[in-house]
Regions:
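Conserved Class I SAM-dependent methyltransferase catalytic core
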Residues: 88-145, 149
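Conserved SAM/SAH-binding beta-strand->alpha-helix loop
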Residues: 18-20
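Mobile active-site "lid"/loop adjacent to the S-adenosyl-L-methionine
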Residues: 55, 64-93
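Conserved SAM-binding loop of SAM-dependent methyltransferases across substrates and taxa
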Residues: 1-10
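S-adenosyl-L-methionine
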Residues: 26-54
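Conserved SAM-binding motif I beta-strand of class I
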Residues: 11-16
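Short alpha-helix immediately C-terminal to the canonical SAM-binding loop
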Residues: 22-26, 117
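Conserved small/polar residues in nucleotide/adenosyl-binding loops
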Residues: 190-192
Length: 192
């Protein structure tokens, strides 16, 4: 929903495998009067060829499950487990299918955990995507990064730019200056 305010794209399509989560997303779209700009589809990421075809999107944003299959403690809440663990899709599925639906030169934006960065880059190269930009996200400047933001380009060259780290909070636990600036820009885009 925030992306509709931030970009000039004419339409956004969301894909969600969990029916209840897809219904919640659809309700948010309707409550925000964005039905003409946003479509939510309940479907399996591994079926993008059937759902969409090949080379149909300019941009794909993904927030895949962070935990590799068979690792970490899987909680009792199935919906949360599917969101956090590679139960219904793997990192390879996400990157392969993203590459499939992107036009040549299209961009994929992903948020993931830094410990998976090696896998992400290898899989991007395997599926003819080039990592273009990378940003490590730190909870505080004194703490290790716990997220990585990565942009890939389908068929792009191999030059990668590592951007300055994004720090979320200062040492007192207050929003960092970077985050306040980002929130300010986002709020200026939203028309209430």
């Amino acid at each position: 929903i925030l992306m509709t305010a931030k970009t000039a794209a004419s339409h956004f399509t969301g894909l969600e495998i969990q029916e209840e989560v897809a219904k919640m997303a659809s309700r948010s779209v309707m409550l925000n009067h964005l039905g003409d700009k946003v479509s939510i589809i309940c479907g399996d990421l591994k079926n993008t060829k059937t759902l969409f075809g090949k080379g149909v999107f300019n941009v794909v944003t993904v927030n895949p499950p962070y935990m590799a299959g068979g690792s970490g403690l899987v909680g009792a809440d199935y919906s949360k487990a599917v969101s956090r663990h590679e139960i219904l899709c793997s990192l390879e599925d996400v990157i392969r299918e993203s590459a499939n639906v992107l036009v040549a030169g299209g961009r994929m934006y992903m948020v993931h955990r830094p410990y998976r960065l090696g896998d992400i880059i290898c899989l991007m190269k395997q599926y003819k995507m080039s990592p273009r930009r990378l940003c490590m996200v730190h909870p505080k400047a004194s703490q290790e990064a716990n997220l990585v933001l990565i942009e890939g380009i389908r068929g792009g060259n191999t030059q990668i730019r590592v951007e300055a780290p994004l720090v979320l909070f200062d040492e007192d636990g207050q929003e960092s200056r970077q985050i306040k600036m980002i929130h300010g820009r986002l709020l200026s885009l939203i028309h209430i």
